[in-house]
Amino acid sequence: MLLFDKGYAHIKQEYITPLSQQHVNYRSLNYKNIKTVLCEGKFTSVECVSKNRYSLTFDEDIIIPALLGDMWLCYIRACLQRDATQKTYPLYPNFCPNWSIVSDYYYAFYSACTLLRLTMRGNIYFDSAVQKKINMNISTVLGDAHAVSENSTYVIQKDHTRSGIYIMDLKPSNHQTHETVWHEVAAVIGEIRANASARSEERVALDCLDTVLHVLDNNFPSKLRNAVNYQLPYGIKAIERKIYPAQACQLCNKWFDPILSFEAKKKCDDFKRVQLFKAYTKYLDILVNNLIAEYNDLHGRKSGIESAINKHRSIPIEFPDATYTYQ
């Protein structure tokens, strides 16, 4: 099944191509990121759209490196979590299912965060000190008191009327951090689906995924994590083998099948829910790795982030670098 086709090509053209015109290195990640450019007031203009919502104008050379910095920070977290998750399970086949699912979830969560940055959007949390700085910067430009929301989201788009200019739509989030991420990821999936050819295998697969997200909720990975981690009966379910480690639910070359075979009217038990979680998040993981490979290819060289990570590790992490096309 061809999972990455015309819809995927749209994402590559719309987002990865402009991102590939810029580069950030490992040493610059602490200051080339979205929070820093907002704290330092590096926008050229700002407009208050509504309460706590702002349209900020940036030069391309400022905002794209900051966005890449955010993306690599999320990617590093995903890589560390993936490495720990993948190496733990083979060593401990009786690894607690509850903790396996939770550990796998955080790997998926940071992959999802990486995908958002690759598609020029993201979730952002401002602690009180950061919030105060940004409020002051915006208020100074606008001439009266303004404030950003503690939990916010942003979308960055090219201004097609002015060369080298990007606009950030910074607005309050209606959800907490994890919920926000999964709702935003569903929007990315919707964009890929909308640009897929009507009768393509990619569209069929994404139609099935859309049904899963509609029935179980966009936020179902986080709901699963919360249930197995906090609800006491899931300890008994683990002992009685009614839930399994996330890694045990992988279906080799047919890993997308739980999504393709999903029936909206049938009851979805815990085991099926974990299978769907694994299939969905593996799709996101492959999508992210593909897009990063596309970025490196378009940019003309690898980022150097992976080698910088391994420079500080006694046991190197293995990074996927080949793009993936078929299920």
Question: Each predicted region: which residue ranges?
Answer:
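Terminal alpha-helical segments
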Residues: 1-327
